[in-house]
Amino acid sequence: MDQISYFNKTVASKDMSGYYLLKNGEYAYNKSYSVGYDFGSVKRLDRYDMGALSTLYICFALKKHDSDFIKAYFDSLKWYREIYMISAEGARNHGLLNVPTDEFFDTKHYIPQDLAEQRKIANFMIALERRIVAQQSLVDNLKKYKRGLSKAVFS
């Protein structure tokens, strides 16, 4: 994320030692749970060429799979079953799951090995996401229209 537009200032230190450099298309696992993400989340860096992440994240790149398919897979939360088996939460972790890096990379994921099949699934998920975004935009515009109409009618 762009710090200036989000925080209205630069909040990062000039000393970047102790951080991971994530490149566009690479993934990071955030071990913190939040609403809707009981076992954390895996996200792909898409908006920027590079980003710096704390060593609290588990960062990785994939070479043998379709990246859009893997993004959809991690968005599905299907992988939670494996994380559940290896995670523990300590009393002082403030919502940070104890997921050892080596065990994270040893988890089993049952995904199609055929790249063409992965690509078909990814294309379907991308088309569906675009449809959702378009429908949400339509809903947002209708809500604005309703507010304007209500204001005109009831004032």
Language-model segments: residues:
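Amphipathic alpha-helical coiled-coil/heptad-repeat segments
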Residues: I111-S155
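Sequence-specific dsDNA recognition surfaces
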Residues: M1-A28
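Short, solvent-exposed loop/turn positions at domain surfaces
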Residues: T10-M16, N93, L115, I126
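A short beta-sheet element
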Residues: Y20-N24, A28-W79
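ATP/adenylate-binding site constellation spanning eukaryotic-like Ser/Thr protein kinases
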Residues: S76, T101-F104, R147
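A short glycine-rich beta-alpha junction/loop motif
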Residues: M50-L56, E89-A116
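Positions in alpha-helical segments
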Residues: T55-I58, D68-F69, F105-D106, N123-I126, ...
